[in-house]
Design a protein with these regions (language model features):
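Extracytoplasmic beta-strand/coil segments of soluble accessory domains associated
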Residues: 58-75, 91-138
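Structural signature of Gram-negative outer-membrane beta-barrels, strongest in the C-terminal barrel
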Residues: 267, 308, 341, 368-487, ...
């Protein structure tokens, strides 16, 4: 009854807020229609494919360059892509990138991977070979090299673009960028001036958000935002509620100051949430961050210094494990034009993770608290061998407390073909650094220890080879294709003791192998109102145990990945200032634990009522009332979601 009263109170508060907001929106709609004709949708929807190909990206070289000439397999999810989609959070928006595989396992939990290695819960292997950043702030957790998906929330209307690189990015971004880099870039505050309100309600998602931006003086602007949401529970394989619904409130700000040569950005966020558990208890999450970035733009060089603090606290039910991580990061970099044909970027930084873990009788870390200090220095040189041919070579040296100094080199050759196509080839090296979960964990059943960390655990390593092309053969067609081969060594395995007894088990590095495959996607502007965007990734994994491996749990312990996944996105601008966008996705069968292939569909119908008002009806997972994306007992039954939304700018 207490739980019921609490939930009813939550729904009453949100229903009142949503009703008030919808009343304001309907009033604004009536007055706007009385004043005149509705305005067109966002300008980006009117861009040609050629203009989209020249969107500036920064994640490939840590400096601004046109997407068409970037020598990497990079896909850009634009602001307009997100606004027109049915996505209600960042993981759902990432499904728009055909070079990513996003799997939902619970109401607040997602697995995000690129080019394989999405993890295998049977062996406690997590998706840990992908680096995710928000405005240059790493959101990966040092405890197990993965992410907490419940910390990825930003106001989707404030996202400028998401740059998704499939392939190694360690030379510029550091360890754990083994299979890819995701850089979520939010809009400058001068682009978000005025007031904005967003209200949404559906069978699974209820959300209310607001933002206000203004000018401080001639050179400075700011914005402040806040939102609160509730996401309903999924179902278990037995058809009962999974009790995994969750709620979260988040607020933040951003200020931007700029002159002809200098710019300064200061931004921060704070959040608090509650997550229900299968045993009907509650977990909590708290956190926040503060970031400052200064840039100086000179005639022949650019300089940047960035510092941030991040706090992430995850609490299980009363008496359960709690994870607290405080991150302190400082980074400097400089880009120098060393002559007409040479550009050098160099820099370095230091990061400190201060973590504390509340041990339980079944899960312990020894020691339970620790400070991890990581240092790095890098340099990369882009040399123009000819007017259309560039050679890029870089190397980063990174020092972490578990493995010491490690070199992370990268070499690329790119060829710009008449401005309409780019070809590139690359060879790179990256690692996944050891973590407390590898070195310091102790797992027990009663007094019996069945798993212990291994202080001799080594970094997982990959040497990656890639060749690709990006082209626009006609004004209405663009495409990108990349073929890759990744050679892995020292992959994590589960081992057992031989000399004395079978237990405790421990983590080893006795697996190696390779993956190879293709990423491909494109755009076809059928006419001035309809665009189709197909994409596919095919991956083949060939792994083997090294001599001396126990071979417990088999090769499948490394990953449980489909051999292929594909997307087809349709975007239509319809009469009367309406739009219809749909994204169909296919995910191949999982080998072990097994799961059949499936198709799913997300769609949104939007009406740009006026320059200030947008109404929409959207749905996710529309093909099935419920479906499984990860086999039980590790994945819940993901439920179909339908939602109505109203956005109001004033």
């Amino acid at each position: 009854m207490a739980r019921l009263r609490q939930e009813c109170g939550f729904w009453s508060r949100h229903a009142a807020r949503a009703l008030m907001t919808c009343s304001l929106l309907l009033g604004a709609l009536h007055s706007t229609l009385a004043r005149g004709e509705a305005a067109p949708a966002d300008d980006l929807a009117r861009m040609s494919l050629g203009e989209l190909a020249n969107i500036e990206v920064t994640s490939v070289s840590k400096s601004s360059e046109g997407l068409q000439r970037a020598p990497a397999a990079i896909y850009v999810i634009t602001h307009d892509d997100i606004q027109r989609s049915a996505a209600t959070n960042i993981p759902e928006a990432l499904r728009l990138a055909p070079n990513l595989l996003v799997t939902q396992t619970a109401s607040s939990a997602y697995v995000i991977s690129a080019r394989g290695f999405g993890g295998n819960p049977n062996a406690q292997n997590f998706a840990n070979k992908l680096l995710i950043l928000i405005d240059g702030r790493s959101v990966y957790t040092p405890l197990f090299s993965g992410i907490y998906a419940n910390t990825l929330d930003v106001m989707l209307q404030d996202v400028e673009r998401i740059e998704v690189i499939s392939g190694v990015g360690a030379t510029l971004w550091g360890a754990n960028a083994m299979n890819g880099v995701i850089n979520i870039i939010t809009r400058a505050s001068y682009l978000t001036q005025g007031s904005f309100v967003d209200a949404a309600a559906g069978n699974q998602v209820q959300e209310l958000g607001a933002r206000y931006g203004d000018r401080i003086n001639g050179d400075a602007t700011f914005r402040a935002y806040g939102f609160e949401f509730h996401r309903g529970a999924m179902e278990t394989a037995g058809g009962t509620t999974a009790h995994d619904g969750w709620s979260k409130g988040q607020g933040g700000f951003r200020t931007d100051w700029s002159t002809d040569r200098d710019s300064l950005t200061v931004q921060g966020d704070f959040y608090r949430g509650t997550e229900n558990m299968l045993d009907n208890s509650d977990g909590m999450l708290f956190g926040g961050n503060l970031l400052a970035r200064y840039q100086n733009h000179g005639a022949r060089s650019d300089f940047q210094v960035q510092a941030y603090f991040d706090q992430n606290e995850q609490f299980g039910p009363a008496g359960g494990t709690a994870f607290v991580v405080h991150t302190y990061d400082l980074e400097v970099q400089q880009t120098i034009a060393a002559g007409a044909s040479n550009r050098i970027i160099w820099g370095g930084g230091e990061r400190v993770y201060a973590y504390g873990i509340t041990n339980t009788a079944s899960l312990l870390f020894e020691p339970p608290s620790h400070d991890l200090t990581l240092g790095d220095a890098f340099i990369q040189d882009t040399l123009a061998l000819a007017s259309s041919v560039n050679f890029i070579f870089g190397i980063k040296y990174e020092d972490d407390p578990f493995s010491g100094w490690m070199p992370l080199p990268d070499a690329r050759l790119s060829w710009d073909i008449n401005g309409h196509a780019t070809m590139w080839a690359a060879a790179s090296r990256a690692i996944r650094s050891p973590t407390p979960f590898d070195d310091e964990v102790v797992e027990k059943v009663g007094p019996f220890t069945y798993l212990a960390g291994n202080t001799q655990f080594r970094p997982e390593q990959v040497t990656a080879y890639e060749i690709g092309t990006r082209a626009q053969p006609s004004p209405d067609v663009s495409l990108s294709v990349a073929a890759f081969c990744n050679v892995y060594d020292d992959l994590r395995t589960i081992e057992h003791r031989v000399a004395k007894s079978f237990f405790p088990l421990y983590w080893g590095n006795l697996m190696r192998g390779d993956t190879f495959g293709i990423d491909a996607w494109g755009n076809w502007q059928i006419n001035n109102w309809w665009r189709l965007s197909p994409g596919v990734t095919w991956v083949r994994e060939r792994l083997e145990f090294r001599a001396g491996a126990s071979q417990l749990l088999g090769i499948a312990q490394a990953a449980d990945d489909p051999s292929s996944h594909a997307t087809l996105t349709s975007s239509m601008n319809l009469p009367h200032h309406t739009s219809f966008d749909a994204s169909l996705r296919y995910v191949g069968a999982l080998p072990e634990p097994g799961l059949q292939h499936y198709y799913e569909l997300d769609a949104r119908y939007g009406w740009q009522v006026s320059e200030k008002v947008n109404l929409s009806l959207s749905g996710t997972n529309l093909l099935h009332e419920r479906h499984t994306e990860l086999p039980a007992p590790f994945g819940e039954q993901i439920t179909r979601s339908v939602m109505a939304e109203a956005r109001w700018k004033f």
